[in-house]
UniProtKB/Swiss-Prot annotation:
Domain comment, as recorded: The architecture of this protein is similar to that of Src-family kinases (SFKs) with one N-terminal SH3 domain, one SH2 domain, and a C-terminal kinase domain.
Modification Phosphotyrosine occurs at: 184, 304, 416
Recorded superkingdom: Eukaryota
Domain SH3: 9-70
Annotated organism of origin: Mus musculus
InterPro entries for the chain: Csk-like_SH2, Kinase-like_dom_sf, Non-receptor_tyrosine_kinases, Prot_kinase_dom, Protein_kinase_ATP_BS, Ser-Thr/Tyr_kinase_cat_dom, SH2, SH2_dom_sf
Region (Interaction with PTPN22): 9-70
Family: Belongs to the protein kinase superfamily. Tyr protein kinase family. CSK subfamily.
Compartment(s) of residence: Cytoplasm; Cell membrane
Name of the featured protein: Tyrosine-protein kinase CSK
Function noted in UniProt: Non-receptor tyrosine-protein kinase that plays an important role in the regulation of cell growth, differentiation, migration and immune response. Phosphorylates tyrosine residues located in the C-terminal tails of Src-family kinases (SFKs) including LCK, SRC, HCK, FYN, LYN, CSK or YES1. Upon tail phosphorylation, Src-family members engage in intramolecular interactions between the phosphotyrosine tail and the SH2 domain that result in an inactive conformation.
GO terms assigned for molecular function: ATP binding; identical protein binding; metal ion binding; non-membrane spanning protein tyrosine kinase activity; proline-rich region binding; protein kinase A catalytic subunit binding; protein phosphatase binding; protein tyrosine kinase activity
Binding annotation for ATP: 201-209, 222
Catalytic activity: L-tyrosyl-[protein] + ATP = O-phospho-L-tyrosyl-[protein] + ADP + H(+)
Amino acid sequence: MSAIQAAWPSGTECIAKYNFHGTAEQDLPFCKGDVLTIVAVTKDPNWYKAKNKVGREGIIPANYVQKREGVKAGTKLSLMPWFHGKITREQAERLLYPPETGLFLVRESTNYPGDYTLCVSCEGKVEHYRIMYHASKLSIDEEVYFENLMQLVEHYTTDADGLCTRLIKPKVMEGTVAAQDEFYRSGWALNMKELKLLQTIGKGEFGDVMLGDYRGNKVAVKCIKNDATAQAFLAEASVMTQLRHSNLVQLLGVIVEEKGGLYIVTEYMAKGSLVDYLRSRGRSVLGGDCLLKFSLDVCEAMEYLEGNNFVHRDLAARNVLVSEDNVAKVSDFGLTKEASSTQDTGKLPVKWTAPEALREKKFSTKSDVWSFGILLWEIYSFGRVPYPRIPLKDVVPRVEKGYKMDAPDGCPPAVYEVMKNCWHLDAATRPTFLQLREQLEHIKTHELHL
């Protein structure tokens, strides 16, 4: 086996591990944390030609940067890798063997349901401390109270504060990976000190979306404070590390705070959601070229997801954002999964979801195609809610009997044909996104959209 690392191909993204001031004129200086893109290999394998975010090119040392990788699919990321759930006192003691002072884990309490137990190895034996849950706060001594388990563990890591020892080494639950370690390893961890949060631009059930500044660039930041919700959003962030396309909202990085906060930092989309953009401008402002361009933007993003075996599951105009220069980009990867998995259908948007996905939880690229047809209808109706004048409870029974919405007012017949093809009840007869893109490009070339 050769120990020589394979050369990074052109287009590879790297993140700087150290500052590099450059010594020669052809060098490209950079700061720790900068993202650089490889342009070409040089004769010397220790140096690459690269460019920075403003397009300046130069030579960089390979050992000063690390390649950015996607977080591996299937990696079980955890904000609390030391949390072992429902295990018994005896199981906890076996896990903390051989004894090592400061080795710890947290489990659910068996004697006091709803409470937790902190188990710590100390001078050859294991101590079990009950963590009481009272008035939405956690405490061991009823003197110091914490919002969540992460804050509690962080406190006792810095100071024993009455315990037999401070917490030194987490006993990681088998099969899980500490989220911060994994984002750092793969080059996606950002530095909180360099992020300025400026103003709230959206509120969700999970937390706020804020306009921020990261190293002089405008960014959007999802701020998730609740540890359980943050855990769910880790999956979204790890999917985003694997995806890169000009019509997908780009992840810039992730910040995992010791106290349990999670910040997902993405490019800032100045003109907001496509549905609001359409409603606020309407027919008098947006012509046929503009509507078809948005349709193609989304289709190209979905063709990329299709080619990479990802299913979005929540495609709708509310989950497409518009940039300063009027490019539509697909966002909200909260439900995006590798194509093979199934999902609970409790919270699915009925009017956008394919019948087989609602009925049998069968999600596939073809169920995304159904949703794309609905999204086309939203675009050409300037942001109307689909199935107007039909009560929500009646939508699925009517659709399953073959009902299809009429064309929106003024919708070109060729575009309406594309919509209807997306709404075949038999998923297998729906077109692929590649075919849809070709159909939309044909419409554009022959000016059938005007």
